[in-house]
Amino acid sequence: VTETMPIRLKVNGEAVSALVEPRQHLADFLRLHLQLTGTHVGCEHGVCGACTVRMNGDIVRGCLTLAVQADGAEIETIEGLSESGEIADIQAAFHRRNALQCGFCTPGMLVTTSELLACIDRVPTREEVRSYLSGNYCRCTGYQAIVDAIVEVAVARRSGSDT
């Protein structure tokens, strides 16, 4: 019998209390307990970026972070960022630029992109975008369309126009 531990956290603004196994990863907790399946689990080693979520405002890998480590934290998933409208322009640009194909990497790409655009006060260079996304793998697109979409959003945000 595995011992469980209580955790309390906020997920996408909602208070959550649960009993979790000490070794359960945050990504699995989000997917299995809360049915927030936009957080994908790919490599389970923190290198592919598919499990990227925000914890207390910083991006973390949900496959490396234990659910018990999120006790008391505020977690934002792709569902929360999408529902809030915070990433609507990024999602629209990804769609317009065909920056997604199978979609498996897309949630992690969008979460990482939202952090990039929030922490830089200018339009990033294409090389800076590629460097920032270096922890997010895509096996389908070749990254060109992803970088195009991100630069498009950065330019639009700087000019104050809608994308």
Language-model region placement:
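Signature of N-terminal electron-transfer/Fe-S-associated modules in redox systems
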Residues: V1-T163
